[in-house]
Design a protein with these regions (language model features):
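Short, well-ordered strand-loop elements centered on a beta-strand within folded domains, enriched
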Residues: 22-31, 109-113, 155-160
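Conserved N-terminal beta-strand and adjoining loop/helix that marks the start
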Residues: 1-27, 48-49, 81, 102
């Protein structure tokens, strides 16, 4: 009997950040009609890496497709790489490697481009996120909030969802 091979799915996430008063805010989209985490406030820009594409190009392309923004690859600040397992239950036939970036500079005004997939777009203070944020994204946003407050830096590599544990590799 042969066991099925699992897939490794790479994705790029881009956290768009701005200062509002004395707080750092992140842009989140309300997911709908996707079959995954619908009703959750998720990263404003995220998507799978296409064949032959780097994660930097993916993040820039997704910013244009999802929000109508031009974000130059050189404006992307690497945050962390996350290796994660199935986070919705059932057999884990795939694993994911998510590359998280942030940016504070872009061209254009963010607007929902994919209205069938995203119901709303809002800025949230990092210390006042909505209740429903995908768990792996909430973890990264929490580490970022700690770093920006002068605490420990975001770990460069993390694992998430393996037997319900989060682990960090920070040297």
């Amino acid at each position: 009997m042969t066991s099925p091979r699992f897939s490794l799915v790479p994705a790029a996430y881009l956290l768009l950040l701005r200062e509002h008063g004395n707080r750092t805010e992140v842009l989140l989209q309300l997911r709908q009609n996707t079959g995954y985490m619908d009703g959750y406030w998720a990263c404003g820009v995220a998507g799978h890496v296409e064949p032959g594409e780097s994660v930097l190009v993916t993040a820039s392309r997704e910013a244009e497709e999802e929000l109508g923004l031009h974000v130059a690859p050189e404006a992307l600040v690497p945050l962390t790489a996350m290796h994660r397992s199935n986070d919705v239950g059932g057999a884990a036939l795939e694993q994911r490697v998510d590359f998280f970036f942030s940016a504070r500079h872009w061209e254009g005004e963010p607007r929902v481009q994919e209205k069938t997939k995203n119901a709303d777009l809002q800025w949230f203070a990092l210390d006042s996120l909505p209740m429903r944020v995908p768990p792996h994204e909430r973890a990264v946003l929490g580490w970022l909030r700690t770093q920006l407050a002068g605490g420990a830096p975001v770990p460069p590599v993390v694992v998430f969802g393996f037997d319900g544990e989060v682990g960090c590799g920070d040297g």
